[in-house]
């Protein structure tokens, strides 16, 4: 029995299966004038949000990079969009030297989304150097990265944050040498 193409759809094809749209590129552009990146989950949200709609993190204490000086904003755009991984890595390094909380989101985004392992490694290093507790979750996610150098740097970053946020032990030494704080 021959099929006539003039008589309706092919019965062997699923009529409900629409053509799949092309998947978005792994590196979508972040407009830092209208968006900010959550430092905990790495997702882009509106710049006006004080809480991440994806993970619920309070962002009110972290200034969006879009509201900051033009140099930081341009470095963030370069770090996220430049085609050369070496340039992106240097932009991340320079942003890290500023040592400000507002770059946490950019570093998180690059750690989770950049295709180059050296760029992701640099982002993990800078997140560890900032010692912010929000970075712990994203560094823990980076432990599953395909690259061993990124995983190693994520471990180092977690160690840096843990050392910085860990309360010092008051009672060190042998029992006789301890200071009695109840006097």
What does each model-found stretch correspond to?
Residues 40-43, 53-67, 77, 86-100, ...:
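Structural detector for internal amphipathic alpha-helices that build alpha-solenoid repeat scaffolds
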């Amino acid at each position: 029995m021959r099929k006539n193409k003039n008589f309706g759809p092919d019965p062997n094809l699923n009529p409900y299966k629409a053509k799949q749209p092309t998947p978005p590129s792994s590196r979508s552009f972040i407009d830092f004038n209208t968006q900010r990146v959550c430092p905990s989950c790495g997702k882009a949200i509106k710049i006006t949000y004080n809480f991440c709609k994806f993970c619920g993190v309070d962002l009110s204490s972290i200034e969006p990079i879009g509201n900051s000086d033009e140099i930081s904003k341009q470095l963030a755009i370069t770090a996220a969009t430049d085609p050369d991984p070496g340039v992106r890595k240097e932009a991340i390094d320079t942003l890290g030297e500023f040592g400000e909380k507002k770059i946490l989101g950019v570093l998180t985004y690059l750690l989770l989304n950049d295709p180059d392992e050296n760029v992701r490694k640099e982002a993990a290093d800078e997140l560890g150097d900032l010692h912010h507790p929000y970075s712990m979750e994203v560094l823990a996610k980076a432990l599953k990265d395909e690259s061993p150098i990124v995983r190693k740097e994520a471990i180092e970053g977690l160690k840096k944050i843990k050392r910085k946020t860990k309360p010092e032990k008051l009672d060190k030494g042998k029992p006789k040498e301890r200071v009695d704080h109840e006097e």
